[in-house]
Amino acid sequence: MSIESYILGLQKNPSPGKIGKIVLGGLELLAGIYEKGVVKKYEKAGRNARRMPIPVISVGNITAGGTGKTPCILKLAEMLHKKGHHPAILSRGYKSGLEKVGGVVSDGRSLRISQKLAGDEPYMMALKIPDVPVLVGRNRIISAEKAIKLGADILLLDDGFQYWDMKRDLDIVLIDCTNPFGYGYSLPRGLLREPMEALRRAHTFILTKSEQADVSVKTDIKKNLFRLAPQALILESFHSPSLLVPCLLYTS
């Protein structure tokens, strides 16, 4: 068992045992240090955040792991494009070949770089919506400037809730109904990427995997969200298979 798997098991376990409690106590101390660092970073970035000349919409979450951000941003880009807008998706391209230096995956007409350089998700998004530019890079201010030159009139920040260098006009936060608040602790004690109070910045919440949660669970989630951000709109989404795609199996 890996250390990561062991820690995840402890996070989920309501009765971790004596050794587990000691480990969790240590992780809680680290979580406190992590939180202070996150808050300090947010305050510094917030003071210098750039306002772009076109609207910026962020789609993100507050927990580590997948909550459905990619399907959401694809749907949003598709809807905006159908309404006559020219959105562009800005992704960090985590662990991609161009994460540090940045690059254009698609200019809205054709693919410009390989999947290896782009990263799996940005490349998939570029294939899925070929009319929408997709750009990668840690510095999304630079990506935004490139997107505007390509004709974008709306910027979509993929996984943007913790990207504080750019001001946004709409913050959409996805909440996974199966584990909405990351066991109630910040990393590494829990899965929160920043303190719960950060949800006050949100303008819209989308509850994902709603079909997997009881009504009472969703009611509790909504109460917590309303307490933190009474101004925010709360929506629900459902996951369901749309088609089966045949796959080829490769063997060595």
Predicted regions and their residues:
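Beta-strand-loop-alpha "switch" segments that mediate conformational coupling across diverse proteins
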Residues: 234-245
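Phosphate/Mg2+-binding loops and adjacent switch elements
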Residues: 94-229
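Walker A (P-loop) phosphate-binding motif
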Residues: 43-95, 106-107
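Hydrophobic residues at beta-strand termini and immediately following loops
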Residues: 59, 175, 237
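Conserved small/polar residues in nucleotide/adenosyl-binding loops
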Residues: 250-251
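Hydrophobic anchor at the start of a short beta-strand
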Residues: 87, 171, 234
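A transmembrane-helix-recognition feature enriched in membrane-embedded lipid enzymes
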Residues: 2-54
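A structural micro-motif
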Residues: 54, 85, 132, 154, ...
